[in-house]
Amino acid sequence: RITQIYEGTNGIQALDLVGRKVVGTGGELYKLFADEIRHFTATACADLAEFTRPLNIALDNLDELTAWLLDRSKNNPNEIGAASVEYLHAFGYTAYAYMWALMAKASVSREAQDDFYASKLGTARFYFARLLPRVQSLAASVKAGSDSLYLLDADQF
């Protein structure tokens, strides 16, 4: 996440994600991403439920945000810019959750034999408990829409 600061282009990347890759494809590229995660969670063993359940919830949240953006941006292109950074972050938190779930899958059967794998599971549990829930507040920001961004006239700044 530190590369966001170093690059200084987070807003541009967010606009590219939402404008070109999500809205610009009618959600088709997003669907590929979501389908990969759904396949993983549907085929994961029961030992991974502590990760797959919240991952599915986060993905459902992202599905809802994506549908909301696709619908709202048809009539108001300002929604793309207004939602892009928060959407990028929600997308990123969900993608990281998927990566942590994959690492948990590789670690769950080895936790007792190796501290490395135990630490991977501990970190995954931390991520799911402390960081992934942030997608809820990001969703609220996205759904606040663009109206409040345009309440002030330029001379009021």
What are these regions (language model features)?
Residues 21-24, 34-157:
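C-terminal amphipathic alpha-helical interaction region
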